[in-house]
Each structure stands twice: as C-alpha cells, then as structure tokens.
Amino acid sequence: MTENLGSFCLVLHSHLPWVLGHGVWPHGMDWVNEAAAETYIPLLMELYKLVDDGYHPKLTIGITPVLCEMLRHPRFINGFVGYLDEKFNVAVNDYNDFTENRYEEGRIKLTKWWQEFYSRVKENFIQRYNKNIVGAFKKLQDMNLIDIITSGATHGYSPLLSKDTSIDAQFKTAVDSYKRHFGRPPTGVWLPECAYRPGYRWKNPITGEEYERPGVEYFIAKNGLKYFFIDTALLLGGKSQGVYAARFPLLAELWKQFESQYKEIPTSFEKSQYEPYLVSTTPSTPGPVGFFTRDEKTGIVVWSGEHGYPGCAEYLDFHKKNWPGGLKYWKVTSPKLDLGKKMLYWPDDVPGKLDENAGHYLNLIKEILKDYKNKNGKKGIIVAPYDAELFGHWWFEGNWWIARVLRWIEDDPEIDLTNSRIFLEN
C-alpha cells in the first residue's frame, strides 16, 4: 500500500502598481499588458485545460486590490486587445523582414509561433473569459479549486506604517474590494513583502510618548482574515536570502546597527516550516489567525535564474529582444553568456526539459515530506510561494511547468494537492 507523505500547496502572489493613465512604455500600460498576456491568461489557459482533462488544480493565488481593480478597469480591457493586435502585427512584420533578408529558417518559423501565441491569448481573453480575467479566476474559486487571497489595499508595508489606523484601513479596504469582485469575503491575506510586525511598546521618537501597539495579526483578525504567509527566517531565525543590503551601503549600515541591538528570544518548542501555526490575538477579535511558512528548498530551484529551472539552456531568454518590436527569438543557452552569443530558440526542445524539471521538483517534494514524516511521526505541508509574474513573463515556459507539476501531483497517491484554505479547514 502506498504511504501518503503529506501535502503540497503552491502559492502565486500577483501584484503590479497602478499604471493606468501613466503612459504606455516602459512603466505604463505595457507593464500590466505584458503580465496579462504572458502570465495571467496563459496561467488560466493551463488551469482550465487541467479542468477540461478531469483534474482539480488546487492552489492559492493572491490578487492584490490594486491589480484587481486594474484588470477590471475599462481602460485596461479596451487597451489590452489593441496591445495583443500590436504584438501580432510585430510578428507579421518580423516574418516579412526575416524572409526578405533570408534569415535562418528556424527564426522565420518563430515569427509564426509568436503569431499563434498572441492569437490564442486574444481568443481566450475575448471568447472564453469574456474579457474578464478576474472573473475567470473567480470561477475557479467557485469550483472550490483555487483559493484567492487578498493583500494590503495599496500594498502598504505594514511594519513601517506609523498609525495603526493606516494598517487597519489597508486590510479593511482590501476586504471590501474583494467582496465586490468575488462575491464573498477572503479567508487569507498576503502581507506586502511578507512583512510582519509583532505587538510591542512603541515610543514616539519626537514626543517620547509610549503606548502598546498590537501586532499585524490583530488587524488581520479584526477584518475577518484567517491566515497569512511568512518567510522562513521569521520562523526559524537566521538571515533571509535578500540582496538589497549588498546593493545599498546605507541599508547595510542600518542592518549592522539593528544586529548590534538585536537579542534572540528563546522558544520553548522546536518549530518547522512544514506545519502551520496559530498566532493569538486579543479577546476583541474573532480568534487566532494562522500562518504558513515559505519553504526555501523548493523555492530556490524555481526562482533562481542561475541555479534554478529558468536558467536551463533550452528556455526562452528573457533579456535578448529583436529590434524593432521587442519579440524574443533566442534561448538562454547559458545564464551568464554574452547576449551576442545566445543561440536560436527551438520550441521542440522545451517539452522534454519541462518534463525533466517537473520530475525533479516532484521528487524533491517527496524527499522533503518523507524526511519530515520520518523525523516527526506526522505528515507535513510544503508551502511554495512565488511571484506569479515569474511564470510566463520572466520564465516564459513557467506556466507549462506549473501544469505538469499540478497534474503529476494529483496523479501521485503519496502527495495531497491542496490550497491554503482547504488545508486549514481540514
């Protein structure tokens, strides 16, 4: 009899700042257009294909209020169709140019490949999703497959908001926006930048006034939210895998100052990122809230362009683009290779590499869950959060990889595929 090892929960966090009315390129409308064309719609296409094939693609997806409002705005909806037509025409112009100048046959074929890509995205956007990306995700949630979570209304960094009323307003407004778009209150929340602050006695640096400030969990519970997500270092200690201190000397100095004043608080029990926990709140809130912890082992093999799957030679290179038009015709070849030496992209080489990477990921999940169960005598859960825009935008083939992972996990009796809401309810 096959032994069940535990659960796996994929979490995709999607967020963009408000760009409508701020021009087109490079940080205006094209920002959300690219994300919709390369990430959100291709992800929906893969999820609905799984449903059509009889699968149950369970995962957690965060759509921030700002992004949600943008995707429902008429300016985006009308402009997005024009964007897709424009990209299609770029591929047509490239075909004519490459043919006239007798470029290699593979590069000419790729222009047709791009035409087919943007045609499929447009067809699904208009015909299957009725120009409503948010509604297409809502339908999957109504089918009890995905769990859509919210975030701070303006993606405000909660620990640095000086007034508690501002923190409260972030979550209250987010819940109100969510109800309007999804017809129900959210159960979970993605803290912007995973930034959490516990309760403490705060001293005003100007007036010297002191008073008790509740932790972020208080405002989460107050607004009816039941769980959030944290980075591994917040639970287990140690340094998080950030890069900003290395880039900004002043930030590094501030970090040194913090380290000199920091004292580790001992805990009375061993903690693990492979199980959720509850954080107590005040009696005035509905009850404690739960939190899940990011697993770094499954994280680094995906988000790292140098050590992870996106850096494989066969995948489409993100940086090298054809001018004019900006379409991509080259593969990674090697992550650190000069752009001038990148080789032509061959779509036929991709499925085999995707199978290899998805198989490796599945085995990694099993190894982690099996090790945890052997050591602790109980089943754990791997929570794997990523920026949604990594898949499709940065890693073009990423959504195809996600589909393989979800399909193969559901076929595997050793792993339970779940989302955060279902797991906590059970």
How does the language model describe each region?
Residues 3-108, 127-131, 135, 164, ...:
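Trp/Phe/Arg-rich N-terminal binding region typifying the photolyase-homology
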Residues 3-7, 12-16, 85-167, 237-379, ...:
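Active-site cores of enzymes that catalyze phosphoryl transfer or operate on phosphate-rich substrates
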Residues 13-17, 62-68, 153-156, 163, ...:
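An acidic- and aromatic-residue-enriched active-site/binding cleft used to recognize and process polar
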Residues 19-23, 70-75, 159-163, 194-218, ...:
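A short acidic (Asp/Glu
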Residues 43-58, 130-146, 180-184, 219, ...:
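A structural motif corresponding to the C-terminal end of an alpha-helix
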Residues 167-195, 366-376, 380-383:
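CE4/NodB-like, metal-dependent polysaccharide N-deacetylase domain
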Residues 170, 218, 397-426:
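Extended hydrophobic/aromatic segments used for targeting, binding, or gating
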Residues 170-171, 177-178, 187-188, 194, ...:
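Extended, regular secondary-structure scaffolds
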